């Protein structure tokens, strides 16, 4: 769902044409899971907005045990009780967005006083036995990312991802654009981060295709070279069941509805096929930054 208890400066969903649709109920989401299983889709990520705002989250995770399951969250509602329930429902991993080890910086970027709750949520998830990672969208305000990694390690986190700012939603507004790192600045941040992560025994991945050349990322020692997976390795379902190319691609391209259209029709949709063909080139680009987005939306 896209309801949220934060107002992040770089939110990919905020202000999007499909950002205010009506949510499916519990029974409908369970039907979605059945259809995804029938299509042999191996992994489901519960994301948002903020998925922990749904009272049926544990029930849905429990219904999704056939899949590899992941939860993307800001962590603020990960109480000891909810963390334990998610663990018992066989949630495979949880990714918490942590912008900074500094409360003032984190709070400025999420638009609310949420740092304490997020840190508590990370601690609770770790204590419950969940596999926990942090994700950090990088910008000029939190470029001291190495400190955030040190802090996360002190909380018991051993996995981290970071990204550039996806040009979608609020991240296209003047306030967000003003904080974007240049390629050289991003390279400097990643160089320090890779070194610190290695010293802490953490696994670190950079997940944004197209921000830096492949040779630069390999030279930094990053093991994952990101490439666009839209309509190829991942797709997304909006709160009303509409299928879109990826969770950030909410500007008007719709590929069908998972509850009313057969999966084969969605998968073979001409728009889906065109986007997938671009993804399959493995050119390490983000299609939200290329002309293919405009062509698909035309």
Spans of model-derived segments:
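Processing junctions and N-termini across compartments
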Residues: 2-5, 222, 280
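Short Cys/His-rich local motifs and their 1-3 flanking residues in nucleic-acid-associated proteins
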Residues: 6, 13, 233, 248, ...
């Amino acid at each position: 769902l896209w309801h949220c208890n934060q107002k992040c400066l770089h939110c990919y969903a905020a202000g999007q044409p499909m950002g205010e649709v009506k949510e499916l109920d519990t029974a409908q989401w369970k039907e979605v899971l059945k259809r995804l299983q029938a299509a042999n889709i191996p992994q489901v990520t519960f994301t948002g907005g903020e998925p922990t705002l749904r009272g049926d989250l544990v029930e849905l995770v429990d219904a999704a045990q056939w899949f590899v399951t992941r939860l993307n969250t800001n962590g603020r509602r990960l109480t000891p009780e909810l963390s334990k329930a998610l663990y018992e429902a066989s949630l495979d991993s949880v990714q918490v967005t942590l912008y900074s080890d500094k409360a003032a910086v984190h709070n400025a970027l999420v638009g609310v006083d949420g740092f304490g709750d997020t840190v508590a949520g990370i601690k609770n998830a770790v204590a419950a036995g969940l596999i926990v990672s942090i994700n950090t969208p990088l910008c000029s305000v939190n470029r001291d990312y190495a400190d955030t990694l040190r802090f996360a390690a002190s909380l018991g986190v051993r996995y981290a991802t970071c990204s550039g700012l996806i040009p979608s939603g609020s991240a296209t507004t003047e306030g967000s654009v003003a904080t974007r790192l240049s390629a050289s600045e991003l390279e400097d941040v990643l160089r320090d981060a890779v070194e610190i992560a290695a010293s802490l025994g953490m696994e670190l991945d950079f997940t944004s295709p197209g921000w830096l050349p492949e040779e630069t990322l390999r030279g930094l020692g990053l093991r994952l070279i990101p490439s666009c997976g839209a309509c190829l390795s991942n797709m997304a379902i909006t709160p009303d069941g509409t299928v879109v190319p990826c969770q950030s691609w909410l500007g008007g391209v719709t590929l069908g509805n998972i509850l009313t259209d057969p999966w084969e029709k969605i998968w073979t949709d001409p728009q889906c096929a065109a986007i997938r063909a671009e993804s399959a080139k493995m050119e390490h680009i983000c299609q939200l930054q290329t002309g293919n987005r405009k062509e698909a939306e035309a």
